[in-house]
């Protein structure tokens, strides 16, 4: 095989309002807006990974094919914070120990507990070990 491999440099999110999403994601991840170039708004780099928001004309209409998993020590507290920043709960799960959330334009991401991830023989992941679940109703 060759002597080099590719590395992830940036995560770019297509959106209608890059200022709005940069504000949401910047507050969520503790990153500042550092640049605006053409249709892009850029957040500060953390751990080598850049994050930008590109303005596009088309609205989001289907489920993401790629999403981020954000690890947190307290799922319910982080859920409340996401909602206060303008995000929302996207789906409920009875098991698995994670929450599917959406940013203000509907881009899905997951909140997962810090720690262990177990994968069964069918490839299904359970976050945080056995017995951890989260409420499935939005009011919990």
Regions found by a protein language model. Give the residues of each.
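Amphipathic alpha-helical segments
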Residues: 17-32, 78-84
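Short secondary-structure junctions
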Residues: 29-36, 86-92
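A generic structural micro-feature
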Residues: 3, 60-62
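Short hydrophobic/aromatic beta-strand micro-patches
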Residues: 12-14, 69-73
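Vicinal oxygen chelate
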Residues: 2-13, 42-44, 49-54, 83-140
